[in-house]
Amino acid sequence: MSFKVPRGTQDILPGQSEKWQKVEAIIRDICRVYRYNEIRTPIFEQTDLFARGVGETTDVVQKEMYTFEDRGGRSLTLRPENTAGVVRAYVEHKMFGAPDQPVKLSYLGPMFRYERQQAGRYRQFVQFGVEAIGSADPAIDAEVIALAMDVYESAGLKDLKLVINSLGDKETRDTHRTALLQHFEPHIHEFCSDCQNRLQKNPLRILDCKVDREHPLMKTAPALTEFLTEESAAYFAQVKSYLDTLGITYVVDPNLVRGLDYYNHTTFEIMSTASGFGAITTLCGGGRYNGLVQEIGGPDVPGIGFALSIERLLLALEAEGVELDTASGLDVYIIAMGEDAKQKAVELTSTFRAKGLATEMDYLDRKMKAQMKSADRLGAKYTIVLGETELEEQAAAVKHMESGEQHKVAFSELVNYLSQQS
């Protein structure tokens, strides 16, 4: 019997994993300069957390969650997203009492959704996201958007489009809800069963329908921006003003609602405009969620965040032809000829590694030519050849692989010599 990875998952092999590490390093450095501290939450949570936090009418909750009962009869779910989990941790650990607000958090880890597999979308996928909880200042909205843009631009992407919208406050959404009901209700039988279920629970979700997106009523649906209260309109204007100050280009799309129920006020997506990217262009999505903390059992504290898929980021890099610098960083490859030389190679390998020098040696007792080819394939900066002569002289032949220059260096001076050259 042969085994393969489960449908919708993938193995990330050497050669690819270095690209992941490079992207992750870029992300961690950006979080450092923006001061978003990492939080690590469980990969499974109580199922009710997502039903309450993400929204019972969303596709995520109704169709895409991996839910199971543990041996104690508790319903648990592999996290389909991480905002709800981070907010749960924020409430549970009373982070709202921290002296410095807002609390700025970042996360990076696997999420799970039962989705149809397609390019850049998996049932287990890695998501990076940030949450800024504790401020309703439009400037923090702009900061969160700027951070997301920085991730893509620092990775080397250029073909990007930022789309923003405002979902307004509760009064805005209540008025808009009434208008949507009047618009869709007479013709709701023409829509899919999901939309029919959403009509009374959350008609805004109809605008996010993937089945009936081309229905004529979708194009004539009342835009939420037409119902913004004076306060909501002023807030959105400030967000746009801060983005202008930061030199960030954006497009306002009044139909952008996102697929999760907790959003209000600012919502945004970053898309790839690369010609080879494919049909699904969204790379990142986020927005403000001023009622979520209270919904999950905490105080009335505002928040904003986003999440992006690492898989889709890598796909966008490929579409634009961007090559990440993933050099192996191998400092030394030791070539040993004979058992005595191999004993010395083992000793030197350990010594070099202890001094922070990335070192490799041969473990197949191959001929010198084969070992030299391995050193070249691995991108070694230096090779050290050990044989009978070198052992007798207590000195090694050190070759700089790029220039071809070769020097004889005493064993006792090898660490100093290599450290100075690296």
UniProtKB/Swiss-Prot annotation:
Coiled-coil regions, chain positions? none
- Pfam family, any one: HGTP_anticodon
Q: Which reaction does it catalyse?
A: tRNA(His) + L-histidine + ATP = L-histidyl-tRNA(His) + AMP + diphosphate + H(+)
GO molecular-function term, one example from the UniProt record = ATP binding
Q: Name one GO cellular component term.
A: cytoplasm
Q: Which UniProt keywords apply?
A: Aminoacyl-tRNA synthetase, ATP-binding, Cytoplasm, Ligase, Nucleotide-binding, Protein biosynthesis
Task: Give any single GO term for biological process.
Answer: histidyl-tRNA aminoacylation
Extract the PROSITE patterns matched here.
Answer: AA_TRNA_LIGASE_II
Q: Highest taxon of the source?
A: Bacteria
InterPro entries assigned = aa-tRNA-synth_II (IPR006195), aa-tRNA-synth_II/BPL/LPL (IPR045864), Anticodon-bd (IPR004154), Anticodon-bd_dom_sf (IPR036621), His-tRNA-ligase (IPR015807), HisRS-like_core (IPR041715), HisRS/HisZ (IPR004516), HisRS_anticodon (IPR033656)
- EC annotation from Swiss-Prot or TrEMBL: 6.1.1.21
**HAMAP family associated with the record:** His_tRNA_synth
Q: Which family does the record assign? A: Belongs to the class-II aminoacyl-tRNA synthetase family.
What is the protein's quaternary organization? Homodimer.
Q: What is this protein called?
A: Histidine--tRNA ligase
- Organism whose genome encodes this protein: Lysinibacillus sphaericus (strain C3-41)
Q: Which gene encodes it?
A: hisS
